[in-house]
Amino acid sequence: MIWHVQNENFILDSTRIFMKAFHLLFFDGSLIFPECILIFGLILLLMIDSTSDQKDIPWLYFISSTSLVMSITALLFRWREEPMISFSGNFQTNNFNEIFQFLILLCSTLCIPLSVEYIECTEMAITEFLLFVLTATIGGMFLCGANDLITIFVAPECFSLCSYLLSGYTKKDVRSNEATMKYLLMGGASSSILVHGFSWLYGSSGGEIELQEIVNGLINTQMYNSPGISIALIFITVGIGFKLSPAPSHQWTPDVYEGSPTPVVAFLSVTSKVAASASATRIFDIPFYFSSNEWHLLLEILAILSMILGNLIAITQTSMKRMLAYSSIGQIGYVIIGIIVGDSNDGYASMITYMLFYISMNLGTFACIVLFGLRTGTENIRDYAGLYTKDPFLALSLALCLLSLGGLPPLAGFFGKLYLFWCGWQAGLYFLVLIGLLTSVVSIYYYLKIIKLLMTGRNQEITPHVRNYRRSPLRSNNSIELSMIVCVIASTIPGISMNPIIAIAQDTLF
């Protein structure tokens, strides 16, 4: 009799577990269908690499790009659906999260053709490179939809581990090894700081890990204004700051930009900021709802330091990649203005709009740098002197992207900054907006210095790198040029027709 009862209990427990697994797979699993497409693409890459020879290399690029495009398509089909929480509260799907996932997928889709010729010329391992890019993309997408502290920690670790491996991909290069070591050590330290902040938040809320439940727990325990929350806020801000790389958490950025392969830098420069921005908006806006004044002050300090230090130090740089590293530090200061403004006054909409333009401007600039580096073997700014005389198309493309980064009208960067600063002004962030305007003028100065060098380099200034430059054909099947053309067009034309982009961004608000 006892055995019969135990057997019935075992059958009931097994059935319950099976039904729960079935529900997770077929119901909750449908909410992560775009991520599942990328996972399937990863499996296909491994299968083809293990069963084929070097002749099937184009298939690897095709599968990677196709899986990313299919994931974007699946994401667009899910647009405007009702917000849903799945996997026992670990993951949330809504328009706000999905627009950031779309931006990450867009970055990866543009970065793969940008990397093709570079990988072939440097004889890097192709399969592993594509695997790391897709895995980092999956980690970034899960981070955008993360709804609890555990997922918010695990997802960026997935992204970070792939980032460390990508930054050290050219292992024979001493600079790459140095960059990887700094990136790894500082990344590990920032992760431990972030977890420590989560532990304070977990304890203060009475043991809650879901973001909304943390708010309810803080209300129930009357701890929403306690010193523990302030400590948690400081540690979490420092941890997230490493991913965003604002000053003073920027020390790793110039070395990693200079030492890593240029396509990797292009990938990391946009995807890490998009994923970290998505995470920061949710963490600051939900668990720290009652501490808005405190985190506003912290982010204002970070934004001011980033805009001033990033743009001032960029003036002194002689390497194009280091200059863009400090420029990106200044750019994230502008993005932080949108995070501070928040849901009110279209702060998030302006941040998303500027992020979209920043992706096209930054990737377009890096595409030009990759192309120039492959044809000349140099990354020094002075070696760009007189490039217009050898390759007008490349010189004009680089000039347009740099001018758009600086925010000159009528390019997309100008309208993105204008919308962002207008929202900040409407929210009363007058000092931040003034600092942003002044530092934008500074950035225009060092961008124009490079453009002047491109266009008017005198014969005595032209280095052997440009004298021996191989002129590109007018019609080229080069995948880097394809990415460059797409990014240059996206950096110029969308600024003229801003209303549809702003309307889509406004639809993503909570």
Swiss-Prot record:
Catalytic activity: a plastoquinone + NADH + (n+1) H(+)(in) = a plastoquinol + NAD(+) + n H(+)(out); a plastoquinone + NADPH + (n+1) H(+)(in) = a plastoquinol + NADP(+) + n H(+)(out)
Name assigned to this protein: NAD(P)H-quinone oxidoreductase subunit 2 A, chloroplastic
InterPro entries found in the cross-reference section: NADH-Q_OxRdtase_suN/2, ND/Mrp_TM, Ndh2_N
Keyword Ligase in annotation: no
Subcellular location: Plastid, Chloroplast thylakoid membrane
Claim: NAD is one of the keywords in the record: yes
Membrane topology: Multi-pass membrane protein
Organism for this UniProt entry: Guizotia abyssinica (Niger)
UniProt similarity note: Belongs to the complex I subunit 2 family.
GO CC list: chloroplast thylakoid membrane
Ranges in coiled-coil conformation: none
